[in-house]
Amino acid sequence: MDNTFGKDVKIYKDAFIRASKIKDHAVIGDDCFITDSTIGEYSTIERRGMIFNSTIENYSYTGYNTVVKYASIGKFCSISWNVSIGGANHDVHHLTTHPFPFISKYGFANENTSYESFNDILKIGNDVWIGSNVCILRGVTIGNGAVIGAGAVVTHDVGPYEIWAGVPAKKIGKRFDDKIIEHLFKCSNRGGVVRPAYRIFKRKPVYVQRKCNP
C-alpha cells in the first residue's frame, strides 16, 4: 500500500512513513516512524514518535518519544512526551511470557503463529489530555475529556471527564459536575467545534453551558 499525503503536510528530516494516510496540514517531526496508520488534519507527531497501525484524528498531537500501537485516538487530544499507548500484551498464564514459542526467528518454532498480543482494543476519545511518561495498557477505553496525570499506568477504563493518576492509575476527581458534562455531550453531538465559535472554549464551563443550550 502506498502513502497518501494531503495538502500542506510538513515532514521533517529522516521521518519514515509507510502504508499510511497523512491528511491536510499535518506535521511529522524528525526521525518519526509511522506505518499502517492515519494521521488527521492539523495533527502533529513530534520528533521520534512511533505510530503503528493506529488512527489519530484531527487536531491531536503527540510529544516527542511517544509510541502508539494499534490504537484509535480522537480529536483535540493533547498527548505529552515519552507516552506509551497500546504496547503488546504478554500472556502471564503461559509457561513463559517470552514470544519465542510463536516466532520462528528465535530458532525454536518452525513457523510464525499468532501471539494475539494486540487483540484487545484500545480507544481514546476526544479532548483527552495525557501527561508525560504515562503508560496505557491494551484493552483500555478512555472517555471524552478525560485527564491522565504524568507517570500514571492506566490498566482500567476511564470515564468521560474523569481525572486519573498514580500507579496503577485511580480516579482522583472529575473536571466538571455532571450537569456541565451533560451539556458538553450535547454540544459534541451537534458536530463538535464550529470555527466561528471557537473562542467559547477559552471560557469557564458555565459560559459554555449557556452557549450550548438549545
Question: What does each model-found stretch correspond to?
Answer:
Residues 147-149, 153:
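A generic "structured core" feature
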Residues 93-137, 167-214:
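C-terminal segments of enzyme domains that contribute to small-molecule binding surfaces
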Residues 2, 13-138:
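Flexible, glycine/small-residue-enriched loop-and-beta-strand segment within the central core
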Residues 160, 165-168:
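Acidic, glycine-centered active-site loop in nucleotide-sugar glycosyltransferases
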Residues 84-85, 153, 163:
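Conserved sequence/active-site signature of Rossmann-fold short-chain dehydrogenase/reductase
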Residues 139-142, 156:
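Basic (Lys/Arg-enriched) interaction patch that binds polyanionic ligands
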Residues 129, 147, 163-164:
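Short-chain dehydrogenase/reductase
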Residues 143-146, 159-161:
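Conserved catalytic segment of ABC-fold P-loop ATPases
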